[in-house]
Amino acid sequence: MEGYKSSPAEGILAKSRPLFDLLQQTCSQYIFACDMQSRCCIVSEKLAEDFALPRGISHDFINFWEGLIHPEDRQRYRESIKAVLVEGRSDIPDIVYRVKARRGEYVWLQCSGRVRCNKSGQGVLFAGVMSKLVQKGKVDMLTG
């Protein structure tokens, strides 16, 4: 795609970047995409701004993001990431967890993602949206 320079590790993200940029301009939710082979990720500008994240394609986003997740919610996050990136599951349920925002307060997010597979059934792209859960009544504090 013209105007986008990428390393070979960025693969599918670089190819999808113009579409990703268009979507982030029209979506009020936070969006993300992860190349399942290279583990490179890209997040929307709004997500990067609200949570002090690196902009552009990041090579260690998954670990960086985990560091922002509330300690009580990290295991649930790890299990979700393992289901997608290690086990290659495409039927993952939505996950709700707390993340430390730019100003230091924790906010509840609901993450919904799906896996795109190649012709041989191998996962190549994990993409989705995250939404803030503003009202306390939206989250069951016992089950998350």
PLM feature spans:
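PAS-family sensory domain signal
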Residues: 12-66
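PAS-family sensory modules
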Residues: 1-34, 119, 123-144
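A general structural signal for short secondary-structure boundary/capping elements
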Residues: 41, 110-114, 141-144
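PAS-family sensory domains
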Residues: 2, 51-126
